[in-house]
């Protein structure tokens, strides 16, 4: 049985989560909602972020008759989940940095977390570290510039390896053996990050784990064939470039629609 899944992010980083879900559960209908107007979320005030997310997500749930919501954004997940779960009767899944598997994989017990400044400073992140990586030295690296580099890449623009090298230099100096990509945008730059850091550092993200969690909550069997009436739509706020629009079209979205800041369709 096909279910309706709403995936939400500030930008196109959540496409990395969406891809993992479509790979594991291709029989479901996917609606990708991204708040491009307020990108990047890692720099927003907490109450601004919470109110903005809730105002967008609640009407979209009703419109697409969602059976489950996935907040495919680390910055939003650390703040918005309680408000959404209090308002909804359907499951809400958030993305958290892969601290636990990183601590388990590390041979040196010296790991890094690369995320937005907002995620880095949140109490939730530090609770994760204390709970699952208390036996590790954890280096924290916050960057909003990497979010914009990922957005630029998705829009068809080249990624400056020189600029990326400069941004990642603090990580190189620490000699961590596992690096958590704690923002859903960052897997978009996996190849470029590996070019800078080398193959000796393991890069971890949460995509596969989120897909498995959605499978559990929907009690879905893994399928390898699309349903005849398979649906994939995208919705966005703000203005997006021609390159980004082209990327969305290559992802198989049947409809790509613009919304107002409070989730209303712009005719």
PLM feature spans:
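Non-catalytic structural scaffold of enzyme domains
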Residues: 1-267
């Amino acid at each position: 049985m096909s279910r309706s899944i709403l995936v939400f992010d500030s930008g196109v980083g959540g496409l990395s989560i969406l891809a993992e879900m479509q790979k594991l559960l291709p029989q479901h209908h996917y609606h990708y909602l991204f708040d491009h107007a307020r990108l990047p979320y890692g720099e927003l005030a907490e109450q601004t972020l919470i109110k903005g997310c809730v105002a967008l997500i609640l009407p979209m749930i009703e419109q697409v008759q969602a059976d489950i919501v996935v907040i495919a954004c680390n910055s939003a997940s650390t703040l918005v989940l309680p408000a959404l779960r209090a308002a909804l009767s359907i499951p809400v899944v958030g993305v958290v940095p892969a601290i636990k598997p990183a601590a388990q994989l590390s041979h040196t017990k010296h790991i890094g977390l690369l995320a937005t400044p907002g995620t880095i400073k949140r109490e939730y992140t530090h609770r994760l570290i204390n709970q699952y990586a208390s036996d590790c030295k954890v280096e924290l690296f916050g960057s909003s510039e990497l979010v914009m580099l990922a957005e630029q890449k998705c829009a068809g623009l080249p990624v400056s390896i020189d600029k990326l090298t400069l941004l990642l230099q603090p990580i190189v100096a620490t000699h961590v053996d596992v690096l958590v990509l704690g923002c859903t945008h960052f897997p978009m730059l996996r190849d470029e990050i590996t070019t800078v850091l080398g193959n000796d550092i393991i890069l971890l993200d949460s995509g596969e784990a989120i897909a498995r969690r959605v499978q559990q909550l929907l009690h879905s069997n893994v399928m390898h064939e699309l349903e005849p009436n398979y649906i994939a739509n995208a919705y966005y706020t703000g203005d997006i470039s021609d390159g980004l629009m082209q990327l969305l079209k290559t992802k198989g979205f049947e409809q790509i629609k613009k919304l107002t800041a409070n989730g209303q369709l712009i005719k």
